[in-house]
Amino acid sequence: MENTQENPTSQNPKPAEETARQAAEAAAPQQEAAANAATDSPASAEQAALAEAQAKIAELQESFLRAKAETENVRRRAQEDVAKAHKFAIESFAEHLLPVIDSLEAAVAHSSDDPAKVREGVELTLRQLTGALEKGRVVALNPVGEKFDPHRHQAISMVPADQEPNTVVAVLQKGFVIADRVLRPALVTVAAPK
């Protein structure tokens, strides 16, 4: 007769093996989670670093845009200031010329037959004009007796003279400078070499 009873050990594994198998099955998700956590840990650290870098980039971009806008504002204000300076630079000078205009208009309105009075009026007006020019730092050049300077003088002719050669003998037309910059060179005659 055959033994119809099966070996209980073949159907039912030993309780220790079963427990080990169950423990292994239960531990598998935990190990997988731990492995994922181990792999997630560098990934999450990388994501955190990436997020931090992106935040820093956004902050720097905003800072750059603000600085660029401020630079544009400064440049625009500087251009406006220069434009205003050019527009109104002559204002002070023009204010000094207004009395000269008043004097000339008065002379035209009250013309006199007396040449002495007319001359006196013209001389006063010339002094007013010279004063206005000097207030604007415009000064006349009268270089008689000075060495010829091609930067400040324009020689019209050379004449024999008792003076040292290349010395200004006569001024045909005054020159003018404004703050050491030549507006118009003086037209002069120069002593010729002997």
From Swiss-Prot:
Its main location: cytoplasm. Keywords: Chaperone, Cytoplasm, Stress response. Transmembrane segments: none annotated. Residues 1-50 are annotated as: Disordered. Residues 1-13 have a biased composition (Polar residues). One of its GO terms (molecular function) is protein-folding chaperone binding. It is found in: Cytoplasm. Residues 21-50 have a biased composition (Low complexity). One of its GO terms (cellular component) is cytosol. InterPro entries: GrpE, GrpE_coiled_coil, GrpE_head. Participates actively in the response to hyperosmotic and heat shock by preventing the aggregation of stress-denatured proteins, in association with DnaK and GrpE. It is the nucleotide exchange factor for DnaK and may function as a thermosensor. Unfolded proteins bind initially to DnaJ; upon interaction with the DnaJ-bound protein, DnaK hydrolyzes its bound ATP, resulting in the formation of a stable complex. GrpE releases ADP from DnaK; ATP binding to DnaK triggers the release of the substrate protein, thus completing the reaction cycle. PANTHER family: GRPE PROTEIN, GRPE PROTEIN HOMOLOG, MITOCHONDRIAL. Homodimer. Belongs to the GrpE family. This is Protein GrpE. The gene is grpE.
